[in-house]
């Protein structure tokens, strides 16, 4: 190994070995690249989800835990069920996906299991240290979690993976949002993925600016299960997450950011895996052609519309259930999947806008336009 005082030269350094970092790393070839990630894939294992098409199902197959061609949204008035021939709502093990990526790295790409320290930016690259060794990279991509404002709109949740004493009903349908829960603190719903009729993931999810104590989410999960007479045989694991629903600030403004840190999470839905994968595929092709700039994940129009949608959620949360249910009602399954992924066309957007509660949406649009944000 080189002396810590003599920098190891790299063509590309990728800071963070999550979805974006590893997706890019697996697509690099004939370049000396290193991923810097302190935690193992198993240590970071959690549930990821996306609407997957056949090619993606094949790509993600080593990590798929469940896949459904039906999904639903529920409120006190009833339920909306979608069934798709083009998309499957798919749950992945992030740990298994990252392990698969690590196993597929080319010989020219390495993995350093350590955090990076003290970046000194130099153009698109820079110099930094990790595990006592100094590195000098021509290009750096940072995929570390972004910095979040404590008062920003976020999607936050606690989830339990459980086995049940008795078979559950509707094990062939993913429940994306069940709004029949306490709405007093912001938009709140239960999210349920049945991996089988006795094995499921249940999450209590909030969309608000205020994070709750973890016991609050746990109580909501317990109450939801009790009301449906679902008895837990064993609790397999618990996960906790916070997803930004506003533009994010990178940890280092001088370094190119990718993934969530680069704005690749859809602001109004919290879905980002498909966008991240697409962004990294385009970036890898660009790098092979000698272009290192990170492509924009979403159009300016989509970002504006998401900000309008989220402003309505933030300032008039009592309309939140109506906003999501109206969206699901006006779109068919494939249109809804595209809308949540951020790939909906103009006609689909027009249908959503026309279905929205008019005054809250117009008011939010005007405020967003005048804010110049």
Set out the residue ranges of the language-model regions:
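A conserved beta-strand/loop capping segment in the N-terminal third of enzymes
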Residues: 52-114, 119-121
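Predominantly flavin-linked oxidoreductase catalytic cores and closely associated redox partners
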Residues: 104-232, 250-251
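C-terminal helical "tail/cap" subdomain of flavin- and related membrane-associated enzymes
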Residues: 281-373
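FAD/FMN-dependent oxidoreductases across multiple families
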Residues: 182, 207-283
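Redox-cofactor binding/interface segments in oxidoreductases and associated redox assembly factors
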Residues: 15, 141-143, 257-259
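N-terminal Rossmann-like FAD-binding beta1-loop-alpha1 element of flavoenzymes
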Residues: 3-35
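N-terminal FAD cofactor-binding segment of flavoenzymes
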Residues: 23-27, 33-77, 158
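Conserved Rossmann-like nucleotide-cofactor binding loop
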Residues: 20, 41, 146
């Amino acid at each position: 190994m080189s002396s810590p005082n003599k920098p190891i030269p790299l063509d590309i350094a990728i800071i963070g070995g999550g979805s974006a970092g590893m997706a890019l790393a697996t697509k690099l070839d004939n370049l000396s690249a290193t991923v810097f990630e302190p935690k193992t894939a198993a240590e970071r294992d959690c549930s990821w989800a996306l609407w997957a098409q056949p090619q993606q199902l094949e790509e993600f197959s080593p990590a798929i835990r469940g896949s459904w061609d039906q999904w639903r949204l529920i409120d006190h008035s009833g339920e909306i069920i979608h069934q798709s021939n083009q998309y499957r709502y798919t749950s992945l093990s992030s740990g298994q996906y990252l392990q698969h990526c690590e196993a597929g790295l080319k010989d020219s790409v390495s993995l350093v299991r350590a955090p990076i320290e003290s970046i000194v930016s130099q153009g698109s690259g820079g110099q930094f240290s990790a595990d006592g060794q100094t590195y000098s990279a021509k290009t750096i991509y940072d995929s570390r979690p972004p910095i979040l404002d404590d008062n920003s709109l976020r999607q936050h949740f606690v989830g339990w993976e459980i086995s049940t004493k008795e078979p559950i009903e509707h094990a062939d349908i993913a429940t994306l949002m069940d709004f029949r829960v306490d709405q007093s603190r912001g938009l709140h719903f239960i999210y349920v993925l049945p991996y089988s009729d006795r094995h499921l993931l249940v999450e209590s999810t909030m969309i608000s600016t205020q994070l709750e104590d973890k016991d609050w989410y746990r109580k909501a999960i317990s109450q939801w299960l009790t009301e449906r007479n679902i008895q837990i045989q064993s609790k397999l694991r618990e996960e906790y997450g916070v997803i930004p629903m506003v533009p994010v600030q990178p940890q280092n403004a001088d370094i190119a950011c990718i993934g969530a840190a680069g704005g690749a999470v859809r602001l109004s839905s919290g879905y980002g895996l498909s966008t991240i994968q697409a962004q990294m595929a385009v970036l890898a092709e660009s790098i092979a052609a000698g272009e290192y700039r990170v492509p924009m994940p979403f159009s300016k129009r989509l970002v504006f519309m998401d900000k309008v949608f989220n402003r309505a959620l933030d300032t008039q949360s009592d309309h939140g259930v109506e906003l999501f249910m109206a969206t699901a009602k006006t779109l068919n399954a494939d249109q809804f999947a595209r809308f949540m992924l951020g790939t909906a066309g103009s006609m689909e957007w027009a249908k959503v806008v026309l279905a929205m509660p008019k005054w809250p949406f117009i008011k939010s649009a005007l405020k967003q336009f005048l804010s110049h944000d």
